[in-house]
Amino acid sequence: MIKIIVAGFKGRMGSTATQMVLETADFELVGVYDPHEAQETVSFNDETAIPVFQRLEEVLAVKPDVWIDFTVPEAAYPNTRFALEHGMAPVVGTTGFTEEQINELTNLSREKAIGGLIAPNFAIGAVLMMQFAQKAAQYFPDVEIIELHHDNKLDAPSGTAIKTAEMIQEVRPAKKQGNPQEVESIPGARGADFEGLRIHSVRLPGLVAHQQVQFGSVGEGLTIRHDSYDRRSFMTGVALACRQVVQRTELLYGLEQML
């Protein structure tokens, strides 16, 4: 039985992750963390009351194996660091980490010999989309990314879009696309510039998480797209990560590292 605590349990992703833990036979929800929650316990599905922790140090009393984090960027880094320092393997879906923070956390995990995962996207289909895009970029160097999310998402572009761009750049040299003399009549019209690759962010109500990688070449085009219509699409990856991190001795970045 893997003992799990969930941080950010009241958010969309956090609540879905909490439900997944409760419904999974080999997982045990030993607590939830929210520094702003006044209640001392909370019940899910009218079952046993689960302790709510407002201070990080309080979490240690239930000795979790895994710390699931779907919070906000300014909280996720100290949360993840705390988890690693106290023997908990973090599974983090919060985006917005800097490269320096990821490197620091990776080094700490190696020191402590504790596994962990930070992943921009836990949907298996999204991970495959990124891998397919990386493969296609070897033959189609002209590419743009369009990512679409619900209008409450805080960061843009999405972590998935950034990760996709990074994977593409591993196999494709920096390349400025479009007409060298092009002019934006409205600033930002061509999207964010990632080493010549353009990323476009759409935020609309009714969306969940979607991404399209658009390739173009002489006389042909290739579109690779993934759609998450429900947040449950991410839970297969979260469950997989929870089982994997307790067997590993290093923090990884990207769910593809565990597939």
UniProtKB/Swiss-Prot annotation:
Q: Which GO terms describe its biological process?
A: diaminopimelate biosynthetic process; lysine biosynthetic process via diaminopimelate
Q: What are the binding positions for (S)-2,3,4,5-tetrahydrodipicolinate in this chain?
A: H150, G159, T160
* Binding residue positions for NAD(+): G8, F9, K10, G11, R12, M13, G93, T94, T95, A119, P120, N121, F122
Major location (coarse): cytoplasm
The alphabetized UniProt keywords are:
Amino-acid biosynthesis, Cytoplasm, Diaminopimelate biosynthesis, Lysine biosynthesis, NAD, NADP, Oxidoreductase
- Keyword NADP applies: yes
Q: Which GO terms describe its cellular component?
A: cytosol
| Localization per Swiss-Prot or TrEMBL | Cytoplasm
Q: Which GO terms describe its molecular function?
A: 4-hydroxy-tetrahydrodipicolinate reductase; NAD binding; NADP binding; oxidoreductase activity, acting on CH or CH2 groups, NAD or NADP as acceptor
Q: Locate the coiled-coil region(s) and give their ranges.
A: none
Q: Which domain of life is it from?
A: Bacteria
* Record Pfam families: DapB_C, DapB_N
Asked if S-adenosyl-L-methionine is a keyword of the record, the answer is no
Which reactions fall under this protein's catalytic activity? (S)-2,3,4,5-tetrahydrodipicolinate + NAD(+) + H2O = (2S,4S)-4-hydroxy-2,3,4,5-tetrahydrodipicolinate + NADH + H(+); (S)-2,3,4,5-tetrahydrodipicolinate + NADP(+) + H2O = (2S,4S)-4-hydroxy-2,3,4,5-tetrahydrodipicolinate + NADPH + H(+)
The role this protein plays is: Catalyzes the conversion of 4-hydroxy-tetrahydrodipicolinate (HTPA) to tetrahydrodipicolinate.
Family recorded in the similarity comment: Belongs to the DapB family.
NCBIfam families noted in UniProt: dapB (TIGR00036)
Mind telling me what this protein is named? Answer: 4-hydroxy-tetrahydrodipicolinate reductase
Species per Swiss-Prot/TrEMBL record: Enterococcus faecalis (strain ATCC 700802 / V583)
Q: What is this protein's gene name? A: dapB
